[in-house]
Amino acid sequence: MNLQEYWLPFTVTHVITLSLIFFCYKWPKIGKVAWGIIFILAGIFNIYTGISNPQAYVDYGSQAVDLYKRFIYGVFSSYTSLIVSLIALGQILIGIFLFMKRTLFLLGILGGIIFLLAISPLGIGSAFPSTLLMAISLVLLYIRYRKA
């Protein structure tokens, strides 16, 4: 994909991200549900796409930082479906944990933050810098939800 093809998903992602920040601040219970659903649906989508069209994930290498490029075009390209499926299972667990309370909720928050920071080096393929803003929204969610 070239930059022109990324423009619409990039813009939509940033609008959603700003909405999530707002919800996590103003209505943390809604933010919690929204994030839980997002992670679960993203995990399901990634399992399906990772199995049916693994090349789509290898294509993200063109926009990634060099360290990620080497990994994507190396080991990852040989085991794309397996690696994407394992990551997607992690996304589903994060989503489930975000529906929980206390320790599991915190694990969901931490897992989500780590995941979002880990995909940031994919560049525009991860809609960077929205991934950093999303991680901030999860921190905000944790702080605000504990007070709600």
Residue ranges and their predicted role:
Residues 1-64, 70-148:
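Extended, low-polarity transmembrane helix blocks
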